[in-house]
From Swiss-Prot:
Residues 250-261 have a biased composition (Basic and acidic residues). SMART domains: S_TKc (SM00220). The lineage of its organism: Eukaryota, Amoebozoa, Evosea, Eumycetozoa, Dictyostelia. The protein kinase domain 2 is predicted to be catalytically inactive. This is Probable serine/threonine-protein kinase DDB_G0271682. It catalyses: L-seryl-[protein] + ATP = O-phospho-L-seryl-[protein] + ADP + H(+); L-threonyl-[protein] + ATP = O-phospho-L-threonyl-[protein] + ADP + H(+). The keyword Endoplasmic reticulum does not apply.
Length: 1024
């Protein structure tokens, strides 16, 4: 409501005051909008504050400067702060939709083309999974007072829209003590008593007061005026609420009314002429009032028309927005039919979770697989197994399907199927809780027990248990496909009863057994051949996996590589394998899924075997050489065991348990600390956890985490890996410690225990990787600097291959080459010198206790980033700026987590498919071998990315034009169909030749790294 402060009461009745009222000016609302960002959701995390300007503010990567998430585009959103009315609106600009969180309201998904008004204390998440920032809006509650002429007009900010749009203003008088509201009413004088009566009635309807022109009717007029005043007050209140009324202008006061009376102040009657003149004046005044009322009515009609037009426009905009949303939904549905979305599931409160997180007590980690991580917990005094499902395997559109699956899992009851107990939201991830079996997985039993400790009868009984459990799942309604059947997903109790587990991510097929599903959740060695060619999953896929499990139980071995691609299509069988077992394995692993038996048929054969064994009293234990030619009494130095204790140097403490080799070791411990492996090659590089300070988590993934910290005053990069380290991996780290080259990230040390270990490496800086360079700065690439980068990349791999022993990278991608520059190295050295000065005392103490440990320095004076993962470079991608001169970039190769040495003892591990499938050489699928020429194939794919980006100024993923259900299917196309990336027609012939030679199907024909470097130098000479 507006209030009027009188500056001069004597001039209240002058007509100028009424005319000036429409010209009152309003001062804008002063609005201050600040955004508050937190790096982490915990309460102790520091807060970054960013104040918005009046007008348009772009929010995106680099705006504000500390916002550097790669998932946020540079023009992700726009926030507009209005200077006139103080409104704050949010417009979505980027592809990743933002989400608005408001108290007591459901989250609002921001879409492009729709503006959303922001309120104080709103929270906005710029994409799914990001930490939301808060919005704080401060406004002046009222307009500033403006004194104009004879009065001061003050308006509340809440009435802004009404007073701006209304043709007139609501006016009230104020006093120094209390503010009272009186309606100022126009006075219309009539010519005669009859007119007085009619006018009184009319004025009552129009909220106006009439004064009579004789003394006899003065009292009545006064009463009418009072009544009309009351009516006006009520009407004014209603008008203020509806914001639609036309308010009367201020008119003459009672002083003018006295001048309009027919009797002079000295009580002398007027003459007829004077009365006639006075009547004429009154008629003229009445006409003016009527004209004014007509104009006011026209203004009201125009205002209503304007409001109707605005409403009509808003309705049209809403209809257009709805049409756009419908089109977007249709496009999304069409897109989902061709390609599955990889967006994580949002676990909502509506999911029926029956176990609370605070009811679970963590005991230990059991392991991790393709579909999730398994840990042992205690729930209400009972040991349970909890599987946390990887977010990347769940999608937003699968919520209803998951709830349906959970409802069916609760109904499963079979002695050979693990009991499903419920679901839980654990650390923000969805978890499935099942019963816990003491002996662990079948793989644990086969690894920890000697072959002679399990009789043939017990092994067949275990196979019958597996077949019975799988037959129950396949004959359930609807049928349940496991998709990841292997020894790790079969649990064993104390009596060697086996139960099928880890089918929490299996999907239900509604069309019967003939239907198939295409959700990949398997492990390579157990995958049936039809899955590779895109045929999808049927129940016969589980039968193939069971054939591999049958081979595991008989041999105690663990399969490696893609068995289905071998000439046999199944693992190699021992020469003395019983014929009945050999036949069953071949039937289950038949390349034609239609010729494989179902589990009902498998059960009949297994029970027949079991009865024959018992009837013949053939309970002899399997001889240790029945399925192996290996000697159990091997020396420690030749051991390839992944679980035992291997000690080649002096070790303090007591070693408990028996030390064996060839996968026959028990879970032995050192000082009760679990499996411990200490080699002479690595003991000087073992770092104690308390020597790493100022640790900061960069990113957390399913099987590892990337951190940064300080070691002896220098910034280091830390890759923390879930799972224990085995003797061969420890020996590998010992060789990596000897790498000292400006072309490779330097290994500093390792921190390890029984459950996990961490690799400590030098810190390269925040310049990102070759992949981020191509994605963000493709326009800066030319043939000169591109070929220079290609030469450096090739030289870094050449260094590894010429190392003694030769090192095969086996995980070459465009993201495993980090960027550094001389300028950045100098700045980092200065920072490290300061850190060294501040931590001299700590370093001295550490040196006294660790005289043999590496000092973590760099012979070249460089402090560079270790990193072994794609995620590390993604977090630093946004920090690549124009300050990094591409012509001065230095390449450092990293990510040796999958590297292997080209030695005879590593022959088996070299057969396993590692790394990114898009870069994997075809011989891994067809020949199951890996050599230095395999690295050259992967290197050629990286060079293809680099040269294509330079040529087209746009980065595209290899095989982007090929439609795949899963990335691993590309191996089938490159191996069986000889598919290769498409080279642009205008690519220089010299470059095309290098690429095509590098990815020859016959690895022997691929050029050496020396040849590639020579040809690149020739290309630079010709093209530059």
């Amino acid at each position: 409501m507006a209030t009027l402060d009188l500056c001069n009461n004597e001039h209240l009745n002058e007509t100028e005051s009424a005319d000036e009222e429409d010209d009152q000016l309003q001062t804008p609302i002063k609005t201050v909008v600040t955004l508050k960002f937190k790096e982490n959701p915990d309460s102790t995390s520091p807060i970054q504050v960013f104040q918005l300007n009046i007008g348009s503010n772009i929010i995106g990567r680099g705006s504000p400067s500390f916002l550097n998430d790669i998932k946020i585009s540079r023009r992700h959103a726009e926030i507009i702060v209005s200077a006139e009315v103080g409104n704050v609106t949010f417009n979505q600009l980027g592809q990743n939709h933002s989400t608005l969180y408001r108290k007591d309201q459901t989250p609002i998904k921001m879409v492009r083309g729709i503006s959303n008004q922001l309120l104080d204390d709103d929270l906005i998440s710029l994409y799914d999974g990001s930490i939301p920032f808060s919005i704080h809006i401060e406004r002046d509650n009222q307009f500033m007072s403006v004194c104009e002429g004879n009065f001061i007009l003050t308006q509340d900010a809440a009435d802004t829209n009404y007073h701006i749009n209304s043709p007139t203003k609501t006016i009230t008088t104020t006093s120094t003590t209390t503010t009272t509201t009186e309606t100022l009413i126009k006075n219309i004088d009539n010519n005669n008593n009859n007119n007085n009566n009619n006018n009184n009635n009319n004025n009552n309807n129009n909220n106006n007061n009439n004064n009579n022109n004789n003394n006899n009717n003065n009292n009545n007029n006064n009463n009418n005026n009072n009544n009309n005043n009351n009516n006006n007050n009520n009407n004014n209140n209603n008008n203020n609420n509806n914001n639609n009324s036309i308010l009367s202008k201020r008119s003459r006061d009672n002083e003018n009314n006295h001048n309009h009376q027919y009797i002079h102040h000295d009580k002398t009657p007027l003459t007829l002429q004077q009365q006639q003149q006075l009547q004429n004046q009154q008629q003229l005044h009445q006409q003016q009032q009527q004209q004014l009322q007509y104009e006011q009515l026209q203004q009201l009609q125009q205002l209503q028309q304007h409001q109707q037009q605005q409403q009509h426009q808003q309705q049209q905009q809403q209809q257009q927005q709805q049409q756009q949303q419908q089109q977007q939904q249709q496009q999304q549905q069409q897109f989902k039919k061709h390609k599955r979305e990889n967006t994580p599931v949002i676990v909502e409160d509506s999911l029926k979770l029956n176990i609370q997180e605070n009811e679970l007590l963590f005991i230990k980690k059991i392991g991790s697989g393709a579909c999730g991580e398994v840990c042992q917990y205690e729930w209400k005094g009972t040991p349970v197994a909890v599987k946390t499902i990887f977010k990347s395997l769940l999608r937003k559109d699968k919520k209803e399907e998951f709830e349906k699956e959970v409802s069916i899992l609760k109904c499963l009851r079979h002695p050979n199927v693990v009991l499903f107990m419920g679901t839980c939201l654990l650390n923000g991830n969805l978890a499935i809780i099942t019963e816990y079996l003491n002996r662990g997985s079948l793989r644990d039993v086969l690894t920890t027990m000697n072959k002679s400790e399990l009789s043939l009868s017990v092994k067949v009984k275990m196979l019958i248990d597996v077949a019975q459990g799988m037959n129950y799942l396949h004959t359930y309604s609807p049928p349940i496909i496991h998709r990841d059947l292997k020894s790790l997903n079969l649990l064993v109790d104390n009596n060697f009863n086996v139960k099928v587990s880890d089918f929490g991510l299996s999907r239900f097929i509604s069309g019967g057994i003939g239907s198939s599903a295409k959700t990949f959740c398997g492990t390579l060695s157990w995958i049936a051949p039809e899955v590779f060619n895109g045929s999808g999953y049927t129940t016969k896929v589980d039968v193939y996996s069971f054939g591999i499990v049958l081979w595991e139980i008989l041999t105690h071995k663990q399969p490696s590589g893609n068995i289905s691609a071998t000439s046999l299509g199944h693992p190699e069988l021992p020469s003395n394998c019983p014929q009945s077992f050999s036949d069953l394995i071949k039937e289950c692993c038949n390349r034609n899924p239609d010729q494989r038996p179902n589990f009902s048929q498998i059960l009949l054969k297994l029970k027949l075997m079991y009865n024959q064994i018992n009837n013949n009293n053939n309970n002899n234990k399997i001889d240790s050489s029945s399925f192996h030619n290996n000697n159990n009494n091997c020396s420690y130095n030749n051991s390839n065991d992944n679980n035992g204790i291997l000690v080649t140097g002096g070790v303090g403490g007591n070693v408990s348990g028996n030390v064996e080799s060839n996968n026959n070791n028990n879970n032995n411990t050192l000082n009760g600390a679990g499996n411990v492996i200490i080699l002479n090659e690595i003991k000087d590089f073992t770092i104690q956890p308390n020597e790493i300070t100022n640790i900061k988590t960069i990113i957390v993934k399913d099987s590892y985490s990337i951190l940064e910290g300080q070691y002896k005053g220098k910034l280091v990069s830390i890759k923390q890996i879930n799972g224990s380290i085995n003797d061969f991996e420890m020996k590998q780290l010992g060789v990596l410690a000897s790498i000292k080259s400006p072309l490779a990230v330097r290994f500093i040390g390792v921190v390890f225990n029984t459950d996990e270990y961490a690799i400590i490496s030098e810190h390269v800086g925040n310049n990102g990787s070759l992949l981020t360079l191509m994605q963000n700065h493709s326009n800066q690439l030319n043939w000169s600097n591109t070929i220079d980068l290609a030469i450096q990349i090739t030289q870094s791999i050449q260094y590894l291959h010429k190392h003694q022993p030769p090192i095969l990278h086996r995980n070459i991608t465009s993201d495993c080459f980090l960027l550094s520059s001389l300028n950045n190295n100098s700045n980092q050295n200065n920072n490290n010198n300061n850190n060294n000065n501040n931590n001299n005392n700590n370093n001295n103490n550490n040196n006294n206790n660790n005289n043999k440990k590496n000092d973590g320095g760099d012979d070249n004076g460089e402090n560079t980033n270790t990193t072994t993962t794609t995620t590390t470079t993604t977090t630093t991608a946004t920090n690549i700026t124009n300050e990094l001169n591409i012509n001065e970039i230095k390449i450092k190769v990293h990510d040796f987590g999958l590297s292997r040495f080209n030695t005879q003892e590593n022959e088996e591990s070299l057969k396993e498919i590692k790394g990114n499938f898009l870069y994997s050489p075809p011989e891994l699928l067809s020949l199951n071998t890996y050599s230095n020429k395999s690295d050259i194939y992967s290197l050629s794919i990286v060079l293809y990315e680099l040269f294509e980006t330079c040529l087209t100024k746009t980065y595209k993923k290899p095989y982007h034009e090929v439609t795949l259900d899963f990335d691993f299917q590309i191996i089938h196309k490159t191996s069986k169909l000889n598919l290769r990336p498409t080279i642009s027609n205008n690519m220089p012939n010299e470059i095309s030749k290098i690429l095509q030679q590098g990815w020859f199907s016959d690895s022997v024909l691929r050029p050496s790294l020396d040849t590639i470097i020579k040809e690149l130098l020739i290309c630079k000479k010709n093209l530059c």
